[in-house]
């Protein structure tokens, strides 16, 4: 009886190894298929020097943004924090749009507007329907070129940024990787 149980156990192990190999093979095929289906990135340069990277995924949605090579690494003692500060101020309104108008326009498009600052870059981007890309580009251009920097908004954002800095400084992982 013990030999019979041992034989069944060995057969079960052999079967399970086979199942595991098939799972790995299928997983590898899925990864390979996914990598092969990533759309090619087309990089072009406009007459004004602006580089444009685009991909056609065939989806009805798009992400469009500005990746500016000016992050915290580009700062010095005199202008420390300016990239992060300007990122925060970008959505406070422009010469053409108040903050409320900007928010309503983006919301009515069903879009999402956001920004972030890293060591290398400051990024402003919009997620929207593909048909709304021209409007999203126009809004982003307006924000980058015509942001208003009102005294009350500056004071309010200053306290927000100082609070964010305290949160980062209290997170040991953030401090170590900084």
Feature-to-residue mapping (PLM):
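His/Glu-rich zincin catalytic helix
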Residues: 2-101, 125-128, 138
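Acidic/histidine-enriched segments that form metal/cofactor-coordinating
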Residues: 17-25, 29, 94-95, 99-178
